[in-house]
């Protein structure tokens, strides 16, 4: 194998890497994917929601054969204090097109399936091997060094996840700052399919996506999540790494307290813990974007910081898929002209501008807006406090609704309310 020269070597068999391999292999390119895990998806962790649009036009109708868990039709967004919660609930009963849908997924299953599609198209996969270094010649990346072997390629796509050491060694990415990432922990809790459907008011393959702000992260930047799978629940939380030194609790303790919350405990009661995982999550959006292109090399997916936390939606998988496709299209174009220079591979960024970078640029100020302690302490307390007063009748003299809202608003501060509101309008 060391004597072969591949058209592309892809480091990482996650979504970006697998899609890049699939698109390249379909066009007859010689592709090698190197994955350090024992299988595709073995080391990949996600909360669990895939927006279908970017994969739908690559594999139309993929959900009919892919191991998706449930079609998300129910959305819940909750503001939580230590013992209470105020929840907004949305149920989508309308018929949607395939590209408008989203699904809960388990990456170990889904990534393995996606890589199988790439292999069937002609891509080669090696697992259980770590790429130690990139091979350079005259300033151009010409291959990789893995397990003592040098494997050459016309181009290399780095899809090796957040905190890519290889990109850092090339000088294309800086060492990840604590302000740019979060720590995510997740439990997979097993329950009978019928119990999940009863508790979340689901029918058939319908699923629910629930996000929680406030007490899950002890008032620090981050939040909790819960996604329904076919016969498991994906439950976890994400907390900004740079805030953990201010935390009064450890992340595992935050998760335990989250599970005991009155709004969560009944949903997971009687469940069996079948898996625990942890992961570092890119949080700064376009503000942590590395140099995407070099001579003979491209960076895609989490390695490029392609993740967006909008508070009400969290995107990463669809961006990774779009980036993988863009990287593959760029390499195919380079193959036609036999030009793998940085200048030629710059087409990659042009492809991204019509998808991931467009979306990330629109919300580039949002990470700084969310990095505000009031978002995860003051405002959840405000929402819960107003809801409590609205629904509590104790026989005392009634109070106008506006007075109830104003009374709780004073705790946040009216200047802060105005300031945060104006900033939110400009950001969103």
Swiss-Prot record:
Record flagged with keyword GTP-binding: no
Named cofactor requirement(s): FAD
A GO MF term: oxidoreductase activity
Pfam assignment, any one: FAD_binding_3
Key word Zinc present: no
Gene3D superfamilies: FAD/NAD(P)-binding domain
Keywords annotated in UniProt: Electron transport, FAD, Flavoprotein, Oxidoreductase, Transport
PANTHER family given in the database record: ELECTRON TRANSFER FLAVOPROTEIN-QUINONE OXIDOREDUCTASE YDIS-RELATED, PROTEIN FIXC
Family: Belongs to the ETF-QO/FixC family.
Chain's role: Could be part of an electron transfer system required for anaerobic carnitine reduction.
Protein name: Protein FixC
């Amino acid at each position: 194998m060391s004597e072969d020269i591949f058209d592309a070597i892809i480091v990482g068999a996650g979504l970006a890497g697998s899609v890049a391999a699939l698109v390249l292999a379909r066009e007859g390119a010689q592709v090698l994917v190197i994955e350090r895990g024992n299988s595709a998806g073995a080391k990949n962790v996600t909360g669990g929601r895939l927006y279908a649009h970017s994969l739908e036009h690559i594999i139309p109708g993929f959900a009919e054969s892919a191991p998706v868990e449930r079609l998300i039709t129910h959305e819940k967004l909750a503001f939580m204090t230590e013992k209470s919660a105020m929840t907004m609930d949305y149920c989508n009963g309308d018929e949607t097109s395939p590209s408008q849908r989203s699904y809960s997924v388990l990456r170990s299953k889904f990534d393995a399936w996606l890589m199988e599609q790439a292999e069937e198209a002609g891509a080669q996969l090696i697992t259980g091997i770590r790429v130690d270094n990139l091979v350079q010649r005259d300033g151009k990346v010409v291959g990789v060094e893995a397990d003592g072997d040098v494997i050459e390629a016309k181009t290399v796509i780095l899809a090796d996840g957040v905190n890519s050491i290889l990109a850092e060694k090339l000088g294309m990415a800086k060492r990840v700052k604590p302000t740019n990432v979060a720590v995510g922990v997740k439990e997979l809790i097993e329950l009978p399919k019928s119990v999940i459907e009863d508790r979340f008011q689901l029918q058939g393959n319908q699923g629910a996506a629930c996000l929680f702000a406030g007490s899950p992260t002890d008032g620090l930047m981050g939040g909790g999540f819960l996604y329904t799978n076919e016969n498991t629940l994906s439950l976890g939380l994400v907390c900004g790494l740079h805030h953990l030194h201010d935390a009064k609790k450890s992340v595992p303790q935050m998760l335990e307290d989250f599970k005991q919350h009155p709004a969560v405990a009944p949903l997971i009661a009687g469940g069996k813990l079948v898996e625990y995982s942890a992961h570092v999550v890119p949080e700064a959006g376009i503000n942590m974007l590395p140099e995407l292109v070099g001579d003979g090399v491209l960076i895609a997916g989490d390695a490029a910081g392609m993740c967006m936390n909008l508070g009400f939606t969290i995107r990463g998988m669809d961006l990774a898929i779009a980036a993988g496709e863009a990287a593959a299209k760029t390499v195919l174009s380079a193959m036609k002209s036999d030009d793998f220079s940085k200048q030629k591979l710059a087409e990659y960024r042009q492809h991204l501008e019509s998808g991931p970078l467009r979306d990330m640029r629109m919300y580039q100020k949002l990470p700084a807006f969310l990095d505000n302690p009031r978002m995860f302490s003051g405002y959840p307390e405000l929402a819960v406090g107003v809801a409590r007063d609205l629904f509590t009748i104790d026989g005392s003299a009634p109070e106008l609704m506006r007075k109830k809202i104003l009374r709780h608003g004073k705790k946040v501060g009216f200047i802060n309310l105005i300031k945060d509101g104006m900033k939110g309008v400009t950001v969103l």
